[in-house]
Amino acid sequence: MTETLNGTCLCGGVEYEVQDPEALGYCHCTRCQRWTGSSLAGVVVANENFRFTKGEDLVKRYESEFAPRNFCSNCGSSLYDDLGEKYFVAAGLMRDLELDPSFHLQVAYKANWHEIGGDAPQFAENPP
């Protein structure tokens, strides 16, 4: 059975759908903290399972040293990181998301005020 999640940016100008999400995880690196203002909770999805349903023309791209980061040019909402064959889609923009976190990456760089709970595996950098 195909699971479909829908998401929208803050202003509602960009809408998208994600099919068959693979995992929900957190990235605690300083780049994600600067991009979102905190650790990034994201859904991993194959890029062929992500599609815009509205406002693709509003999406702009920032080329960073790690991965291209895509955002709404109207409201500035962080949308997703382009990791090549996969996207890491900002979880906070999705309605009815019911996945449990399955990993924490870059924990060595987490903000000192961020307490990590739960039993999802934690990796100081990236998994081996």
Predicted regions and their residues:
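A short Gly-Trp-Pro
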Residues: M1-T8, G13-P128
